[in-house]
Amino acid sequence: MAMKKLLWVVLSLSLVLGVANSFDFHEKDLESEESLWDLYERWRSHHTVSRSLGEKHKRFNVFKANVMHVHNTNKMDKPYKLKLNKFADMTNHEFRSTYAGSKVNHHKMFRGSQHGSGTFMYEKVGSVPASVDWRKKGAVTDVKDQGQCGSCWAFSTIVAVEGINQIKTNKLVSLSEQELVDCDKEENQGCNGGLMESAFEFIKQKGGITTESNYPYTAQEGTCDESKVNDLAVSIDGHENVPVNDENALLKAVANQPVSVAIDAGGSDFQFYSEGVFTGDCNTDLNHGVAIVGYGTTVDGTNYWIVRNSWGPEWGEQGYIRMQRNISKKEGLCGIAMMASYPIKNSSDNPTGSLSSPKDEL
């Protein structure tokens, strides 16, 4: 118990430091073209963004438009704020093409065939805690970054598998997204999108998945490395789908384990989200895979989901976003209740191999 409390203190401190170290700007930075250029140069330095001279002028114009969007939105009375993150000199179309699937239309894959068991094990759950945070319970690894690869589906899958494995074994092991990107090809398409459900099925049928340290992420699609994938570390027994368009059912599932979900993450406010409870403009055109790792309620009574993203720790609240929960639309905010699923693990048993050792535990 003492160790878990210590871990949460460290996490809380990192959240505070992350906010303190985020890139900021002020009214005086918007006063002239020269001050805006200086702001752009500071932003490039902060995020280590390299541009050719010709490209810089084009990107500067995009940056200016994004600065004004962030500035004007933050002046509004909204329960969330935006910031100039690493996407600040990308148009929203470019952002969606790379990070929210519009380039390859992989949101269509989220509507594919379902492989779940057809049952919902949490259907008869009565009451649930007022709040749950699987990070506090030690079931969530550090935030990862998918890079410029449409592999969000793999990251969403891995968060859920890492979570249920920790719940069943009391051991947190970072698992390999790259194995899914390189090797899970029956329905999934690597950096061009995929389905979390199909990834769960792949892990089940294969008998498990290897660790992050054994098969590290490269942010690009490669040939499946057969020498690594047989070193299995964690197995699952299948997966189930949460009843569609039912936030109450989703709540029951998240109260018991992290859950993979698909959302519409293509809006400008989502692109530049910084902190607070996101209530912003979005639709139900599912284009991004994430994972819900908890839920809660603000002091003013706003219900929210704690959503783990895969755009690195500088995006949002140290890589997370709080999204409004229990809205009037049955699909949930940004379609969060439309396609949720989670892995099943019936026992603490895992493959007995070279990777079943303490060295991979976090």
UniProtKB/Swiss-Prot annotation:
Endpoints of the signal sequence: 1-20
Which segments are removed on maturation as propeptide? 21-126, 353-362
Q: How is it modified after translation?
A: The mature protein is not glycosylated. The precursor stored in the endoplasmic reticulum lumen is processed during the transport to proteins bodies to two dominant mature forms that differ by a single amino acid residue at the N-terminus.
What positions carry the motif Prevents secretion from ER? 359-362
Q: Which residues does the annotation flag as glycosylated? A: 326, 346
Q: Which domain of life is it from?
A: Eukaryota
Disulfide connectivity for this sequence is 149-191, 183-224, 282-334
Q: Where in the cell is it found?
A: Endoplasmic reticulum lumen; Vacuole, Aleurone grain
Question: By its UniProt entry, which Pfam families does this protein fall under?
Answer: Inhibitor_I29 (PF08246), Peptidase_C1 (PF00112)
GO biological process: any one? proteolysis
**Could you name the active-site residues?**
152, 288, 309
Q: Which SMART domains match?
A: Inhibitor_I29, Pept_C1
Q: Name one GO molecular function term.
A: cysteine-type peptidase activity
Q: Which PROSITE patterns match?
A: ER_TARGET, THIOL_PROTEASE_ASN, THIOL_PROTEASE_CYS, THIOL_PROTEASE_HIS
List the GO terms this entry assigns under cellular component, sorted alphabetically. aleurone grain; endoplasmic reticulum lumen; vacuole
Q: Which UniProt keywords apply?
A: Disulfide bond, Endoplasmic reticulum, Glycoprotein, Hydrolase, Protease, Signal, Thiol protease, Vacuole, Zymogen
State its Enzyme Commission number(s). Answer: 3.4.22.-
Q: Which family does it belong to?
A: Belongs to the peptidase C1 family.
Please describe what this protein does.
Thought to be involved in the hydrolysis of stored seed proteins. In vitro, catalyzes the hydrolysis of proteins, such as azocasein. Shows a preferential cleavage for Asn-|-Xaa in small molecule substrates such as Boc-Asn-|-OPHNO(2).
Task: Return the protein name.
Answer: Vignain
Tell me what organism the protein belongs to.
Vigna mungo
